[in-house]
Amino acid sequence: MAGQQGIYCAPDNIVPNRDRVDVGCAPDGAMQLWVMEYEVTGIGKGCAMCKAINPQQAEMLLKSNGIYNGSSYLYKVTRIEQVIVPPCNGLMAEQVVTYKDVVS
């Protein structure tokens, strides 16, 4: 079995892959959650979450439905990770932008 891939959100006492089988990105066409980090040429950076069958479709959906969908060539996706949904409740994501990172 391959090593853990994707973002696994769970408490420390939950073992990754305990409740799932390693069957690839989307068995039988099931949709998965994907988180993407990207750059928008000349504008900045961003992140997005998408529900899609595979990472290629997630990227396509970002470019066709994102804020800059009229200029999809501006998007440069730098990272795509599958979100592994935990069997229990928990924090899924958090992002902090510090004041020194914000350009006035």
UniProtKB/Swiss-Prot annotation:
Keyword Disulfide bond: yes
Swiss-Prot/TrEMBL keywords: Disulfide bond, Virion
Keyword Kinase annotated: no
Compartmental location: Virion
One Gene Ontology cellular component: virion component
Disulfide bonds, paired cysteine numbers: C25-C88
Subunit description: Homodimer; disulfide-linked. Interacts with the major capsid protein.
Protein name: Portal vertex auxiliary protein
Taxonomic path: Viruses, Duplodnaviria, Heunggongvirae, Uroviricota, Caudoviricetes
